[in-house]
Amino acid sequence: MAAYQQEEQMQLPRADAIRSRLIDTFSLIEHLQGLSQAVPRHTIRELLDPSRQKKLVLGDQHQLVRFSIKPQRIEQISHAQRLLSRLHVRCSQRPPLSLWAGWVLECPLFKNFIIFLVFLNTIILMVEIELLESTNTKLWPLKLTLEVAAWFILLIFILEILLKWLSNFSVFWKSAWNVFDFVVTMLSLLPEVVVLVGVTGQSVWLQLLRICRVLRSLKLLAQFRQIQIIILVLVRALKSMTFLLMLLLIFFYIFAVTGVYVFSEYTRSPRQDLEYHVFFSDLPNSLVTVFILFTLDHWYALLQDVWKVPEVSRIFSSIYFILWLLLGSIIFRSIIVAMMVTNFQNIRKELNEEMARREVQLKADMFKRQIIQRRKNMSHEALTSSHSKIEDSSRGASQQRESLDLSEVSEVESNYGATEEDLITSASKTEETLSKKREYQSSSCVSSTSSSYSSSSESRFSESIGRLDWETLVHENLPGLMEMDQDDRVWPRDSLFRYFELLEKLQYNLEERKKLQEFAVQALMNLEDK
C-alpha cells in the first residue's frame, strides 16, 4: 500500500504517457461499443487551474480528462540546488546560513542595489574633491553627510564580501573577479582607517591612500558581465602577443643603451640653446625617449636639436633615428595592431558561432514544440471526428434495427390467423435471430476496432472511417472475417489493461533505479566533501 501511494505521489512523464495511452484506448473502445457518451475535452492543466476548476466540476463530475505530457529540463544547476542535495542540509531541522546568503547574493534587487551604490560612491567622491579646499563653514553639514554616506557604502561593500564568504568560502577565492573585488575593497578601506585613527600629514603615502578611495569605482568590473568579457578579450590578445612584446622590450633596451653612448656628447654639451639635452642623460630617460620616438612624437625636432652639436655625427644620429622608426614605429606597431585586430576578429567569430548555435537550437526546440502541438491537435480532431461518425453510424444502425423489428412484428400480426403453435415458434425464431444479429454486430465492432487500433494510428483510422460508411465496411469485410484463421486473435480487454499496467509499473521501477543511482552518487560526493 505504501509503495502504491509513493507511486501516486511521483509524477513521471513516461508513466503518464502510458496511462494516457491506456485511457485513450479504452475510451475509444467504449465509444465504439456505445458504452460512453463523452470524449476527453479538458487537460490536467485546465482542471488544476483555480479559475476554471469550479466550472468544470459543476459541469460534469464524471467526464474524462486528457493527460498533457511536457517534460521538464534543468538547463543549469545553481549553487543553492547543489547545497540542498547535501546530506547534512537534508538532515538538519533548519536551513543553513550559507543557503540564505546565496539567496541574497542571487537576488536581482540586491545586485541592482550594489550597482547603484557604486555609482553613488563615484558621485560622492566627485563632490568631496570639489569641497576639499573649501573653508566655508556653511558646507560642513554637507561634508559630514558625504562622509557618513561614504562610510555606509563601504560597510555595504564589506557586508557583500562577508555574504560571499558565508555562501562558499573556498569558491570565493577560486574566482579571479572575487579576489579583485576583495583587493579593491580593502585598498579603499585603508584611507578610511587612516582618517579614523587620526593620522595627519602631507606625505606621499597618505596621498596615495587617499587616491585609493577612487578604486571603489572599479567594482563595476565585477558587476557587469559585458565589461568582464571585454577585459578577458584584451587579456587573451595580450597572451597571444607575449613573445612579440618580449622582443619589443629587448629592442627597447638595446636602443636605450645605444642612445646613452651615441648621444653622450650631446648630453654633456655646454650649449644653452639645447631643449632636449637630458633625454639621453641616463638609462631611464633614454627608455622614455625611445618610447616617445616609438609614438612618433616630435622626433624630427629632437633630431634637429641633436644636429646642433657638432661633436655628434649626423650620419650615426640619423641612422639611429631612422632605424628605430622603421623597426619600432612601423614594423612592430603594425604587427601589434594586426595581431590585436586578428584576435578580436577570432573572438568575435567564436561569439557569433556560439550565438548562431544557440539560435539554431532555439529554433529547433520551437519547431519540435510546434510539431508536437500539431500532432496533438490533429489526433484530437481525428478522435472527435471518428467519435461523431461512429455515433452517427450507430444511430443509423439502431434505426435500421428498429425498422427491421417493426417489419417483423407486422409480419407476425398479419399471420395472426395461424395456429398458436406456429405463432410461438415464429416468435421464438424472431427473437433468436434478433439476439444473434445484435451479438454478431457488437462482437464484429469490438474485434474490428481493436485490430484497427493496434495496427494503425488514430489518424489513419479516422481517414478510413471517413471514406467508407460503417455498415458498408462491415458487410464488405464480413466474408474475410468469417474465413480468417482462428489462431489470429486480438487481445482481450483484461490482457490489454494488464499490459498497460505492467508498462506503467516498469517506468516507476526504472525511475526508482535512477534515484538509487543518484543517491549513491550524492553519498560519494558527501564523502569527498568531508
UniProtKB/Swiss-Prot annotation:
Expression sites by tissue? Testis-specific.
**Ranges of the Cytoplasmic topological domain:** 1-108, 167-175, 223-239, 342-530
Q: Where is the composition biased (Low complexity)?
A: 442-458
Q: Where is this region: Disordered?
A: 378-458
Q: Is Amino-acid biosynthesis among this UniProt entry's keywords?
A: no
Q: Name one GO molecular function term.
A: voltage-gated calcium channel activity
What sections of the protein cross the membrane? Answer: 109-131, 141-166, 176-200, 204-222, 240-262, 315-341
| Intramembrane residue numbers | 282-294
Main location class:
membrane
Q: Does the keyword Cell membrane apply?
A: yes
Annotated disorder: Deafness-infertility syndrome: Characterized by deafness and infertility and is caused by large contiguous gene deletions at 15q15.3 that removes both STRC and CATSPER2 genes.
Protein name as annotated: Cation channel sperm-associated protein 2
Q: Which organism is it from?
A: Homo sapiens (Human)
